Structures are given as structure tokens and as C-alpha cells.
Amino acid sequence: MSKQEFKSDLQKGYDELKRFGVTKTSAHFFLPPYEWYNDSIAAWTKEMNLQLVNFTPGTLSNADYTTPDEKNYRSSETIYQSIINYEQKNGSGLNGFILLMHIGTDANRTDKFYSRLPDLIQYLKTKGYQLVRIDELLK
């Protein structure tokens, strides 16, 4: 991908978001597709005054898009337990973690992980966590 292709593609995304009142100023975080980036993508993102972000690995939260027919499939229960186990075993818990969840997943994935969010939020709140938006986390 060239620099111009990257900038053009990103601008097309912002043009579409503008229809919903979302601007580059209000949405200045960039999570690359498939969480893949290199030094060029990082530099181009910075040139566009955007903040490159990525999820924190280790919890399997990013596997919520997988479907049962895939080799790397993880059920919502597996993902939920992985997050809980990580929180319990890691000395710092999940402080500062960015969990990635997909609101749009394949129809073949019937156990949508976002359906477990109320359980996860309740668990984390009982452990004393305060959930914040990414712009608050990265101030």
C-alpha cells in the first residue's frame, strides 16, 4: 500500500462517518484493519494527526469474530474465561487494557461475545475497575 492509497482510504472512511456526525477531530484514534501495521503506517497515521492504537494481547478478546468452522475459533465462554483468568493471574490485572470486541460478526457466529458484556462489566466493577472510553484512557 502506498502512502497516497492509505490516506485516500482513510479519508473515504471519515467521509462516510461524517454522514453520522463523526469527524476526524472527534474520532482521532486509528486501529488498523486486522490490527496490522508497520513503521510506514505508524508514520502516516501520525502525519494525519491520528493516534495509532491497538488492543492489548493476551485475553483472546479479539477472537470474537471467529466462527465454529474455523481452526482458530474461540467460543464466547472461552473468551470470557480467558479475560477473567488473565485478570486473576496477572499482578496488574487488566489496568490500562484495551479489549477489542467486534459488534459486527459473521451470522455463523451465533454466540456473540457482546452478549456477555453485561456479565463482564459487572465482574470488573465488583473488582473495582472503572471502565473508560479510549480517549479518557489515553489522555
Descriptions of predicted regions:
Residues 1-100, 104-125, 130, 136-138:
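Catalytic domains of cell-wall/extracellular-matrix polysaccharide-remodeling enzymes
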